[in-house]
Amino acid sequence: MFIMSKTLLEFNNLVTEFHTEGTTVKAVNDISFTLNKGETVGIVGESGSGKSVTSLSAMRLIPSPPGKISGGEIIFHKKNGEKVDLLKASEEEMRSYRGNDIAMIFQEPMTSLNPVFTCGDQVLEAIMLHQKIDKNQAIKLTIDLFKKVQLPDPERIYST
């Protein structure tokens, strides 16, 4: 009998550091927590406390240099029950997870959407980057996503 894990993501003793001007700063130092399926977790802390670095570590988007994930593990529990240590996954594997299985919602809206481009085009670009579908299917999926999050008049929002 297959028992599906309720665990989705595990951070175990994660250490992420930055090397600058002859010194090392541990932005994340030995943090551990578990995210379960269907759970919403808010990472709260003062400016510079490592919130974004923790999330960027999970997606392996720490700029290197100067940053480096130097310890711990981040275990992703896939839908099929397989466990993957994201810190040991290949870059190709990570690209397949980003946007499909793991995503980050930034707190500053200006870092999320570019006002020069339409909302629809920006979401469409992310979908086409991560899914093997044609542009018409991606447009439909984008509008469906806007409907799913209950945006009013999704077709209009797609083009604004």
Question: Which functions belong to the PLM regions below?
Answer:
Residues 2-160:
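ABC transporter nucleotide-binding domains
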